[in-house]
């Protein structure tokens, strides 16, 4: 018996096209939509002439002058970028890293025990329902203003999506595979490496992406508070107090670009570890 290759029906998406060409077409389509939106923004801003709605070209030029016109030995970063962008990214990276590590470890421990999961689930659902910015005043009282308060706010807000998704992913491990692992006498570490983690990875990355967004939001929110000395959020409030609308818009565009780049990088890691066929939808 010979195997027959399945041919996509005529007119179906991707029929007769290489996967690479389809991916290129999708990328071009996404970028064309973005370019069209920027062009409409530019034309509308020029036509309206409002100081509150500057053209994107002016915003981009101001952002380059403000943050990316430094010397080559500093990777073209200005003192303003080193003093505000890098501290924000450092706090966000620390908070997200702690939240991810704690969430994955606790999630696997909770998810592998039905009894522990049943006991902890109400607490987890309650904690997840609390709006993250509402936690910031609590940490201001406990830790006062400063970097420890900002990192703690990020950690306690970003840990829940990772923890809950990891626990649910660990629970979804095929029981038959667990039984086979017991027959083969795999050690707990081998079960974790070869059974539980591969099964939970799609859910883990779904939680990581939610936590990454929350980390960015809490990073900015905690920097908007009085007593903050640097950061992108500080740049926003300082520019607003001086009615420097170009800097306000530049900071907003910078935050959007950072969020997109970080999410794209995490998606690339997910595809590498999980496989194209098991990635979570964007």
What spans do the regions from the language model cover?
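Short cytoplasmic-facing helical segments at TM-TM junctions of multi-pass membrane proteins
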Residues: 162-204, 236
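Transmembrane alpha-helices
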Residues: 152, 156, 188-221, 249-250, ...
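Generic hydrophobic transmembrane alpha-helix motif, especially the helices
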Residues: 125-161, 168-169
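Transmembrane alpha-helical segments of polytopic membrane transport and secretion proteins
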Residues: 1-35, 264-282
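Glycine-rich helix-loop "coupling/hinge" segments at transmembrane-helix boundaries
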Residues: 141, 170, 217-255, 274, ...
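Transmembrane-helix boundary motif in ABC transporter permease subunits
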Residues: 94-124
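Periplasmic/extracellular loop-to-transmembrane helix junction in inner-membrane transport proteins
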Residues: 47-97
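Alpha-helical membrane-interface segments at transmembrane helix boundaries
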Residues: 82-90, 117, 124-127, 144, ...
């Amino acid at each position: 018996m010979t195997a027959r290759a399945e041919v996509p029906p005529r007119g179906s998406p991707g029929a007769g096209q290489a996967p690479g060409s389809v991916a290129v077409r999708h990328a071009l389509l996404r970028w064309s939509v973005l370019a069209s939106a920027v062009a409409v923004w530019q034309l509308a801003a020029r036509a309206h002439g409002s100081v509150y709605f500057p053209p994107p070209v002016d915003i981009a030029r101001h952002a380059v002058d403000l943050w990316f016109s430094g010397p080559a030995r500093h990777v073209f970063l200005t003192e303003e970028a080193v003093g505000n962008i890098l501290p924000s990214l450092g706090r966000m990276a620390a908070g997200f890293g702690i939240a991810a590590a704690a969430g994955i470890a606790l999630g696997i421990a909770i998810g592998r025990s039905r009894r522990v999961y049943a006991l902890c689930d109400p607490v987890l659902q309650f904690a997840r329902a609390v709006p993250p910015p509402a936690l910031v005043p609590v940490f201001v009282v406990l830790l006062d203003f400063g970097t420890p308060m900002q990192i703690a706010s990020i950690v306690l807000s970003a840990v829940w999506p990772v923890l809950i998704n990891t626990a649910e992913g660990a629970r979804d491990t095929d029981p038959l595979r667990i039984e086979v692992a017991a027959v083969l006498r795999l050690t707990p570490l081998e079960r974790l490496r070869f059974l539980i983690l591969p099964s939970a990875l799609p859910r883990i990355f779904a939680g990581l992406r939610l936590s990454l967004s929350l980390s960015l939001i809490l990073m900015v929110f905690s920097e908007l508070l009085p007593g903050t000395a640097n950061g992108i959020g500080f740049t926003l409030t300082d520019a607003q107090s001086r009615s420097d609308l170009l800097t306000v818009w530049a900071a907003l565009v910078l935050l959007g670009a950072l969020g997109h780049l970080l999410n794209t990088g995490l998606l690339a890691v997910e595809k590498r570890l999980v496989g194209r066929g098991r990635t979570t939808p964007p």
